[in-house]
Amino acid sequence: MSTATHKLLKGATGDWEMVIGMEIHAQVTSNSKLFSGASTAFGGEPNSHVSLVDVAMPGMLPVINEECVRQAVRTGLGLNAKINLRSVFDRKNYFYPDLPQGYQISQYKSPVVGEGEVLVELDGGRSVTVGIERLHIEQDPGKMLHDQSPSLSLIDFNRCGVALMEIVSKPDIRDAEQAKAYVTKLRSIMRYLGTCDGDMEKGNLRADVNVSVRKPGGPLGTRCEIKNMNSINFIGQAIEYEARRQIEILEDGGQIEQETRRFDPDKGETRSMRSKEEAHDYRYFPDPDLLPLEFSQEFVDELKAKLPELPDQKKTRFVADFGLSAYDASVLVAERESAVFYETVLDKLGDRARDGKMAANWVINELFGRLNKEGRDITGSPVTAEQLAAIIDLIGEGTISGKIAKDLFEIVWQEGGDPRALVESRGMKQVTDLSAIEKVVDDIIAANPDKAAQVKDKPQSLGWFVGQVMKASGGKANPQSVNELLKSKLGI
């Protein structure tokens, strides 16, 4: 059930609504290709991971890779989708130099996964449910290289035959924000499942985006497809541009041509590639070299029983068990590695219920803040979960103050080391000796008689005195003791 309001675009004739559907091409995580034993490793020398099957040598027959089927079924289960116990591989016929067979082995009428849905969270606590039409398995074609020779186009077949999952959404997406959030959520689910690494820079996750516009609540318009998007930000830019392009044409009295377009990131615009093909243009028919794919319900149930905890389930648990806000829990579970880091911190602290909120604050505000500033991800964090847990522990037991903890975090970030040993060796322990704190308090009050006289009328100025005492003590004074002493001496 959608709770999201969506963005309408203003035109000369009033508001327009976007209608967006997406086809996500996700490379299956497996050691070998869909129908051959060739390696799927990224970055090899051109044409070094190629078998005779991949390049369609005469007499070579495809043999299905069971692991790819397992990964597709696991993904379908993660999308709350219907798993079809019988599916069929079809030949999708078209000519392109990077497709040596002259056809692509795909699935048309009988895909391995049927309808499902994904809950997509948006800013401000809003959400939208995007329906999944189907998930089918197909071969990736090769890669054409046009910049290696002034007169030739070269082909690298390393990618040819690698297993792809094509995840087709229903046209439930209504603006660029929802589209970006949908791709982000799909990628997160597949990373949790281990079925696709989602690395868009390597081409392991690509999106075809279908965009049309209409008057709100009106009939669906003619759609254009933007091909091979490999960046979430570019997806957002392409949708905005394409929708406005269509609105301008319609408001000028023109008609939208159904076509395939590509996005030019340098100019921020879409450009026509070719007219959009219909299914009959591909002359689909069942592949005679492959039997129908059949498996039992027990096979599906066994895979379902072994699924890991997925982002939505983990978020619900974090809110219930650790008292986190829905927002904080969403941030922590967005990437599997972030959730693992957070739970490792809690394991080291020992009392999950007690320390959950404090650990979340440190992970989100201090750690993630610093990682984002330096353009790193959690796997490249200089501060380990064990080190962060030790810092939080030192605060909890009163050994250091929150301010000193931030200084300690900076030292560990830059130099590494054991936080407890650093506190000892650098004299960073919190001062809890009341007589020592009292002397500093007395000195601050004596140096500011006017402010001290006004504090009864302006109780909020107590914070200024606390700040001065903490500054004078180098941040080492126990904040609770400072507050109590100041209130006593100032008569508040």
Swiss-Prot record:
EC numbers, comma separated: 6.3.5.-
Enzyme class, first EC level, given as a word: ligase
Gene Ontology MF term list: asparaginyl-tRNA synthase (glutamine-hydrolyzing) activity; ATP binding; glutaminyl-tRNA synthase (glutamine-hydrolyzing) activity
Bilayer-spanning residue ranges: none
Gene Ontology biological process terms from the UniProt entry: glutaminyl-tRNAGln biosynthesis via transamidation; translation
Function: Allows the formation of correctly charged Asn-tRNA(Asn) or Gln-tRNA(Gln) through the transamidation of misacylated Asp-tRNA(Asn) or Glu-tRNA(Gln) in organisms which lack either or both of asparaginyl-tRNA or glutaminyl-tRNA synthetases. The reaction takes place in the presence of glutamine and ATP through an activated phospho-Asp-tRNA(Asn) or phospho-Glu-tRNA(Gln).
SUBUNIT field: Heterotrimer of A, B and C subunits.
Name the record gives this protein: Aspartyl/glutamyl-tRNA(Asn/Gln) amidotransferase subunit B
Origin species: Bradyrhizobium diazoefficiens (strain JCM 10833 / BCRC 13528 / IAM 13628 / NBRC 14792 / USDA 110)
